[in-house]
């Protein structure tokens, strides 16, 4: 990534990937872990400063492309690093939301007193997948249907028997390949009370 950055120093994408790639899959020593976490923190700080107002549009194209997935596997409190990463993502996507004129989801939805709570599940893993198998299937199947209404937004067209189960369990099921703005509007217009992104 350093070579790519040297060839294109204004690329948000290269710098984003370089920051994330401070985290390795395997470490030989505890010192290697500490060095990696420190490198990630330093590069996140640089990335935060690099993403100026002029670079927010490009950054919006990069959010979610690579994520600090392996950070969850460290047996160390990494809340600070996840918050720092999350702040960058939130700032970038807030800009995207304002630019695309997508109104924020209502913090207080209009529902009748005693009405069901609408739970929106937004995921690309509504199928046989570790996310579905480990916990999401249990959430979908076991939410009390007297109190909760499940809305599923499957962010792709992948279908299997587990997808069919989700379709029959949810009150509303939406799936397909759509752009970010289309999904954002569909989710907003559903007037869900809770958004869950597994």
Which sequence ranges carry the predicted segments?
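Alpha-helical solenoid repeat scaffolds of the TPR/TPR-like class and their adjacent stem/linker regions
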Residues: 1-198
């Amino acid at each position: 990534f350093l070579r790519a950055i040297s060839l294109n120093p204004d690329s948000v994408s290269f710098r984003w990937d370089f920051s994330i790639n401070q985290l390795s899959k395997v470490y030989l020593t505890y010192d290697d872990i500490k060095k990696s976490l420190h490198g990630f923190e330093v590069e996140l700080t640089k990335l935060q400063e690099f993403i100026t107002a002029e670079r927010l549009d490009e950054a919006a194209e990069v959010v979610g492309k690579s994520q600090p997935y392996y950070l969850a596997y460290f047996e160390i409190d990494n809340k600070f690093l996840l918050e720092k990463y999350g702040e960058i993502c939130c700032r970038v996507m807030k800009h995207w939301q304002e630019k695309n004129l997508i109104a924020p989801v209502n913090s207080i939805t209009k529902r009748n007193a005693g009405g069901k709570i609408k739970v929106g599940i937004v995921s690309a893993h509504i199928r046989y997948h570790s996310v579905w198998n480990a916990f999401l299937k249990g959430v979908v199947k076991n939410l009390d249907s007297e109190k909760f209404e499940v809305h599923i937004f499957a962010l792709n067209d992948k279908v299997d028997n587990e997808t069919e189960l989700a379709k029959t369990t949810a009150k509303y099921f939406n799936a397909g390949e759509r752009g970010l703005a289309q999904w954002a509007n569909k989710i907003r217009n559903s007037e869900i009370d809770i958004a869950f992104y597994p």
